[in-house]
Structures are given as C-alpha cells and as structure tokens.
C-alpha cells in the first residue's frame, strides 16, 4: 500500500449516452431542490451559482479550471505501482529480523540501566545496545511486551503497552483458556471469513518514541493479492501470536533501541523438571510473593470481565487496588 499526496484536478470523461442521461436527471433534480429551498429562504445570487457548480451538469461543474482540490489516493495491486510485487515485503529495502515473544511483565529504569521483570519472577538486568539513544527517563515500572531477536545477537526490544494487551498476551503464552472471545480472536475469525490469512507482522519504525507496526494479510489461494494494515504493536503482536505467524523487527530499530542482558540476579538458580523452570527468588523462604499475587488478581479480573461476570470483576478490581495500596505503604 502506498500513499500519493498532491493536488489533483478532477476531469470529466464523457460516459455512455445512457449514463449521461441518468446523470443529467439526477443533477437536475438536485439543482431544482436547492433552487426551491433558496427561494423559500429568500437567498439568490452567489448561493444559487454555487449550487449549480456542485449539482449542475458535468460541463457546468468543471467549467472553471481554476478549481484544484487536494486528493489523497491509496491503492494496492499486484505491482503497487513501483514494479515490485505486493507480496514482496522487502520492497522497501529495509532489513528485518525474526523475533520471539518473551514472558515479560514490566520494564523499569534503574541507575545503571534497565530491569525487565519476567512472569516467573526473574529480573533481567539490561543496558542499552546503543548508549547514544536515550529512552525511558523515569524510573516508574511500565507494562511491556518484550521481543527477543533471533539473529544471534540476543537483543531484547521492550515495547511499553497498556496493561490489558500485556495480560492478554501473557494469557495466550500460558495457554490460559478464556471462554469468551477476545478482540484478537474476532479479528482472526473475520480475516479468515473474508478469505484472507495473516502472513506476517512487522515493527517498521519509531516516531516520537512510538513504535509503528504493520499487519500483512494475503488472499487465500492467491498470495500475490495482499493487504497491509497499520496497527498498534500491542495489537499486532497479539494477533500474530494467535495466528502463529512471524514477528519481525526493523534491524535498525533493534540495534538502536534494543537492550543487552548483562547478568542475571546473583541469587537466582534454576532447576529444569518436566520442561518447567522453577525459580528461587531473591527473597526469604516461606514468604509471600507479591508479584505472583498481583498477577493472579489482574488475571482473574480480566477473565471475569471477558466472561461478562462484571460483579466478580469489580470485586477483583477492588482487591487489586487494596493490594497495591498495601504494597505501596510497605515500601
């Protein structure tokens, strides 16, 4: 998909005789209605001529060549106008790398870099890959979706998002079944019913500290017919994960805004058993894990809201507010 901006002068091309007759009848009726209303209101002169310009016959509407209207045209075809096939996603010349979604919960800035809190309680201490790029100046924790580059660099790209898409993605990662369909399931089903399939999601650029992403669809049975949609990264990544399609990141963005893991928290140890990781957190034994309790409350609240159990969702919300207030007072 491309955008052409510029002044375009609409020109009238003479249609078939039948179409011209029909157009003349419709234009005449509209013109008479405007004329009668203007007379009833006591308006004449320039108002009537303006009406003839817009509702008159084609020859009258375009008699003055001085009228230039700005038009924004968008188009998509098998060539997209530049000789490259629409299915060729690399026609822009940018390089992209594949990435995978990590089970991250939040991102916060510290004095010596950044800390990414994972779903299992693990804290990843990171530094910027490109120190010249300044980001996230405040130290407050932010909900984030973290992508890991699969090109061997192991760079992490955190994307700050709202709480709901972050929790929805974590639920999908953990295979938590939600009885009622989410908006991402609806988009997936609508796409399939229209005869298209999701093929790719890309993080394309960063403008004013905001990431831009595109969702690529292809016609089932005709891969040359494609559609590209502009979406928020949080929505695009959620859709891509549910459709099991690649998530790619602009290599320049990954290098400039990516983070490198410097070292894990020293007090953490891992034991692999039945393909699960158990983490001993940096806290005394037999003490409550506030992060796990907070996550359970948020998850229960969202699940209740999706299932339309609004009374239960309100109760979980109140419990979450009280829990966070208590946690804040303990700090």
UniProtKB/Swiss-Prot annotation:
Gene Ontology MF term list: nuclease activity
Keyword Glycoprotein (UniProt): no
Induction: Up-regulated by abscisic acid, etephon, salicylic acid and methyl jasmonate.
BFN domain segment(s): 126-261
Gene3D superfamilies: Bifunctional nuclease domain (3.10.690.10)
Domain of life: Eukaryota
PANTHER family linked to this entry: BIFUNCTIONAL NUCLEASE 1, VON HIPPEL-LINDAU PROTEIN
Purpose: Bifunctional nuclease with both RNase and DNase activities. Involved in basal defense response. Participates in abscisic acid-derived callose deposition following infection by a necrotrophic pathogen.
Protein name as annotated: Bifunctional nuclease 1
Organism per entry: Oryza sativa subsp. japonica
Gene: BBD1
């Amino acid at each position: 998909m491309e955008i052409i901006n510029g002044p375009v002068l609409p020109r009238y091309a003479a249609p078939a005789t039948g179409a011209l007759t029909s157009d003349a009848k419709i234009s005449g009726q509209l013109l008479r209605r405007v004329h009668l209303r203007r007379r009833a209101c006591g308006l004449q002169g320039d108002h009537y001529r303006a009406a003839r310009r817009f509702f008159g016959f084609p020859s009258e509407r375009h008699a003055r060549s001085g009228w230039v209207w700005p038009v924004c045209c968008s188009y998509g075809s098998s060539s997209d106008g530049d000789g490259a096939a629409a299915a060729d996603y690399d026609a822009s010349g940018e390089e992209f790398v594949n990435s995978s979604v990590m089970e991250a919960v939040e991102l916060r800035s510290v004095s010596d870099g950044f800390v990414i809190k994972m779903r299992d309680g693990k804290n990843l201490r990171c530094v910027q890959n490109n120190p010249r790029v300044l980001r996230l100046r405040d130290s407050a924790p932010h909900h984030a979706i973290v992508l890991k580059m699969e090109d061997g660099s192991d760079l992490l790209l955190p994307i700050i998002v709202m709480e709901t898409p972050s929790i929805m993605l974590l639920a999908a990662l953990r295979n938590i079944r939600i009885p009622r369909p989410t908006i991402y399931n609806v988009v997936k089903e609508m796409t399939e019913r229209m005869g298209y399939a999701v093929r790719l999601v890309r993080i394309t650029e960063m403008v004013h500290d905001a990431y831009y992403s595109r969702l690529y669809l292809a016609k089932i049975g005709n891969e040359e017919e494609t559609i590209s949609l502009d979406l928020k990264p949080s929505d695009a990544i959620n859709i891509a994960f549910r459709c099991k399609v690649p998530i790619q990141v602009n290599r320049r963005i990954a290098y400039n805004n990516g983070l490198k893991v410097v070292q894990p928290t020293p007090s953490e140890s891992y034991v692999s058993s039945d393909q699960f990781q158990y983490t001993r957190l940096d806290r005394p034994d037999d003490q409550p894990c506030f992060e796990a309790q907070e996550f359970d409350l948020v998850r229960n609240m969202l699940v209740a809201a999706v299932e339309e159990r609004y009374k239960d969702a309100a109760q979980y919300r109140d419990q979450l507010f009280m829990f966070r207030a208590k946690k804040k007072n303990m700090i």
